[in-house]
């Protein structure tokens, strides 16, 4: 790459790195090899990626304020939920995952998570039955989403930072390994049939890239059985063509 291309690349990532840093955003020397591979139609030499499993500090004022805000929004039957606008950047920046209580937001049509520090979205988002618009744009720590988001039947619009996503078509970064099972991300119920997961040993975790609203999202599936894995829909065209366990051995289609 010439000097102008390198400068443009640095500028493009400057905003990202002020918010979030991990293997998804490697140093410049790694990008040289990644771009060379993309141009030659080869599998980019991405490093192994790891899921963000940092726990939420539930003693922080930002977390406590968010819990109250969710209760208020549920009680008032609000149709737009934009926590940063109410909490402010400092308090909102203390939140790295949404609480399960977002399931109470039955009337919310627009969920605005713009420029957050979020690392995870809980599976309870699937219970937001009125959700139509999902905006996690510039939330660069959100590399994947729970399969349960596909239960939001009215969801028709999304604005996601594509370059932050595992397996995205631009760069094809590696999916984290799901073997062994990542116990910290196992929900109470099967992602597919909603059966209670009585034993963590029975869970089958898979990655699946699907069309969700106006984006193709990498989704984490927690299935109770192989039968439920087999019931999953076909992945989006141009992505890994089957549910998989991630890792550097998974061959992805060439980057665009």
What are these regions (language model features)?
Residues 126, 137, 145-149, 172-173, ...:
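Short amphipathic alpha-helical patches
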Residues 98-100, 121-124, 145-147, 169-171:
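The feature encodes a structural signal of leucine-rich repeats
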Residues 1-104, 140, 154-256:
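The feature captures the LRR N-terminal capping module
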Residues 119, 141-142:
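Extracellular beta-strand scaffolds
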Residues 91, 114-115, 124, 137-138, ...:
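Per-repeat beta-strand-to-loop junction in leucine-rich repeat
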Residues 104-107, 127-131, 139, 148-155:
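Leucine-rich repeat
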């Amino acid at each position: 790459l010439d000097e102008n291309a390198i400068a443009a690349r640095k500028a493009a990532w400057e905003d990202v790195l002020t918010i979030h840093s991990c293997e998804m955003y490697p140093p410049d020397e790694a990008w040289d090899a990644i771009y060379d591979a993309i141009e030659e139609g080869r599998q980019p030499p991405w490093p192994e990626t790891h899921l963000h499993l940092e726990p939420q500090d539930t003693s922080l004022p930002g977390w406590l304020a968010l819990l109250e805000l969710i209760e208020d929004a549920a009680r008032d039957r609000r149709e737009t939920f934009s926590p940063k606008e109410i909490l402010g950047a400092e308090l909102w920046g203390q939140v790295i995952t949404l609480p399960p209580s977002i399931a109470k937001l039955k009337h919310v049509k627009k969920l605005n998570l713009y420029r957050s520090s979020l690392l995870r979205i809980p599976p309870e988002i699937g219970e937001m039955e009125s959700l139509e618009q999902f905006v996690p744009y510039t939330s660069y720590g959100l590399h994947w989403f729970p399969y349960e988001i596909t239960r939001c039947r009215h969801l028709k619009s999304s604005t996601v930072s594509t370059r932050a996503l595992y397996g995205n078509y631009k760069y094809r970064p590696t999916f984290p390994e799901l073997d062994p099972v990542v116990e910290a991300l196992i929900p109470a119920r099967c992602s597919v049939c909603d059966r209670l997961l009585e034993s963590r040993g029975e869970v089958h975790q898979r990655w699946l890239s699907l069309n969700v609203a106006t984006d193709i999202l990498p989704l984490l599936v927690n299935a109770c059985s192989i039968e439920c894995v087999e019931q999953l829909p076909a992945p989006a065209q141009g992505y890994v063509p089957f549910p998989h366990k991630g890792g550097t051995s998974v061959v992805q289609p060439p980057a665009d």
